[in-house]
């Protein structure tokens, strides 16, 4: 089996769709950290630690910087779930595509925000990350996260341990899928960190491009299904 093998079933769960979504997730995190005041868009654990640290130091201004993305992340999950509940029966466009489209529009706007609005930019990116992680939770039938690594690392290592005890090739394939997701996220973060040196705030538009590819891939799969019917 190849890493980007042909997928049967929902294209939103395919590795091909996830490939670009995961790269985008890594890029977004590097973007807010490198270009928007060292705030994490995805890793809310880090933001909560820093929020708590500044609160106990009595530094309310710095605490607010980390509170805003945390609240935006929660709101993003809520909105994504509302979209799912209201549009899950749509036929022409999949509800997950609506999420991606909203992400593209919001991230495109972030690229125009000046440094003086970094708090706003970070809030929007965190909101987008939450919208992304909520609907895209499976790849090749396995639960995963496209915007953070700790769960994928745990699942991959657990599967690898199971493989060494059972020698089940399917379990090995599962482990490699998880570690592949982590590597893709790291690649996206690396691309984002380098790109910010050259393009600054506009780097986030690369993420828009990656998400656009995923958006179109889901259309292509729908057309293939219609031709096969």
Predicted regions and their residues:
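Symmetry-related core transmembrane helices of the 12-TM Major Facilitator Superfamily/SLC fold
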Residues: 98-105, 202-218
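Short, Lys/Arg-rich, polar N-terminal cytosolic tail immediately upstream
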Residues: 1-12
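Hydrophobic/small/kink-forming positions within alpha-helical transmembrane segments
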Residues: 70, 74-78, 182-190
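Helix-to-loop junctions at the C-terminal end of transmembrane segments
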Residues: 78-91, 196
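A membrane-interface helix-boundary motif in multi-pass transporters
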Residues: 91-97, 190-209
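Cytoplasmic-side transmembrane-helix entry/capping segments in multi-pass membrane proteins
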Residues: 92-101, 122-124, 145-149
């Amino acid at each position: 089996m190849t890493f980007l093998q042909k997928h049967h079933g929902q294209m939103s769960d395919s590795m091909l769709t996830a490939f670009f979504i995961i790269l985008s997730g890594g890029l977004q995190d590097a973007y807010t950290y490198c270009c928007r005041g060292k705030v994490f868009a995805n890793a809310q654990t880090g933001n909560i630690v820093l929020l708590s640290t500044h609160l106990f130091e009595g530094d309310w201004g710095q605490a607010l910087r980390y509170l805003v993305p945390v609240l935006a992340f929660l709101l993003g999950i809520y909105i994504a779930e509302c979209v799912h509940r209201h549009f899950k029966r749509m036929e022409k466009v999949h509800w997950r595509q609506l999420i991606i489209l909203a992400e593209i529009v919001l991230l495109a706007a972030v690229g125009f925000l000046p440094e003086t609005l970094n708090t706003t930019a970070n809030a929007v990116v965190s909101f987008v990350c939450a919208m992304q992680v909520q609907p895209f939770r499976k790849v090749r039938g396995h639960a995963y996260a496209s915007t953070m690594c700790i769960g994928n690392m745990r699942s991959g290592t657990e599967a690898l341990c199971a493989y060494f005890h059972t020698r089940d090739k399917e379990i090995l394939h599962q482990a490699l899928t998880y570690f592949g997701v982590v590597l893709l996220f790291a690649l996206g973060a690396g691309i984002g960190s380098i790109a910010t040196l050259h393009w600054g705030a506009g780097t986030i538009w690369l993420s828009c491009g990656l998400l656009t590819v995923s958006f179109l891939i889901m259309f292509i799969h729908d057309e293939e299904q219609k031709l096969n019917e």
